[in-house]
């Protein structure tokens, strides 16, 4: 966090990555159409990453804030761990992690896998 604070203090660009599942991606609900399977409703402009970007830009007016959204619908923490390098290669100054919704449907072994993967992330 010291490096991030230094960048903000020195008015250097900051990169924040959001890493998670459909909640991170911007999925807010599932729609049911007659005779069709559930259909996710995405509103990426309302995703929490966008809301936090607005807050950062308001609070840190003289610093450019670059947001990377690495949310993928259906991802579990284990799936996220498998693709973490894709996000880290951009060298974000901060990473906000949000997995768990898809992991919550697992049995006890799946919950242990979630915990292990999240610790590695």
Map each language-model feature to its residues.
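Catalytic nucleophile-elbow at a beta strand-turn-alpha helix junction centered on a G-D-S/GDSL motif
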Residues: 13-39
């Amino acid at each position: 966090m010291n490096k991030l604070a230094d960048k903000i203090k020195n008015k250097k660009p900051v990169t924040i990555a959001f890493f998670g599942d459909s909640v991170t991606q911007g999925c807010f609900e599932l729609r049911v159409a007659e005779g069709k399977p559930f259909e996710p409703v995405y509103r990426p402009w309302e995703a929490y990453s966008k809301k936090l970007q607005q807050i950062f830009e308001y609070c840190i007016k003289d610093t450019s804030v670059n947001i990377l959204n690495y949310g993928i619908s259906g991802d579990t923490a284990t799936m996220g761990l498998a693709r973490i390098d894709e996000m880290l290669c951009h060298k974000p100054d901060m990473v906000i992690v949000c997995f768990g919704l898809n992991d919550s449907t697992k049995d006890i072994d799946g919950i242990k896998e979630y915990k292990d993967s999240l610790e590695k992330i």
